[in-house]
Amino acid sequence: MNIVSDTLLENYRNQLGLDPDAALQKLRESFVRADSFNFYTSVAVITSSKIEGEPMEVDSYIKHKIQQIEYLPELTQKPNDLFRAYIYAKENRLTEDHFLHAHRLLTEHLLPGHWRGVYRRNPMVVMEHKTGRIQFEAAPAHLLETEMGRLWEDITELLHRDLSFEEIFYYASFIHLVFVCIHPFNDGNGRAARLLEKWFLSDKLGHVAWYIQSEQYYYQHVEAYYQNLNRLGMFYEQLDYLRAESFLKMLPEALAH
């Protein structure tokens, strides 16, 4: 593995406090209606969007998607773009090309066309949307191609491995974390990172993964979400992934939620 580390995996297993297989079976038994995917994807999309500062309320967006209630386009356009990206992910296997296409979809009303699905070429600092405080400095532009290449090599290897449930959740979270730290796009990185995590879970676990309300859990615990990201350090080349345990625990907590 190049960049996704298994150093914390043993501690993660010991501290999990959850049987992922049993929790997933409970999800399978609970969500049997034909419209379950649209409902839970609507929740995932709007809560992921609100982490990034989108103003539309969660219940309003659910009414928009499930009951076809109309709202002003400036409220619905960007969440709807992200919804289309989730639909695309559901219908396609996780590859770098497919992921870049998903980014093009989710940034249709966020970035100009020539920066959609394209890695940035400029420096990037990551800011917390509510306070405007700088969280950390993302990967320098001259390292982006190398770092994303390393990440996608790891993702591809993991997709071909036979992983336990604990390993699937561990690596999904770690991929999410590394992607956020690299922050490869000019915008849409947070939304894309949470979609990437869910997409990896779906490729490993099947359709039931789309019902895991990880985005909602991160939104409901957004201060902890940012604090756990900040634990690694301020500068990309000095990040300490041994401090990632608190972040890695959030996904299984979402499954138990």
Question: Which stretches of residues belong to each language-model region?
Answer:
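FIC/Doc superfamily catalytic core
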Residues: M1-H257
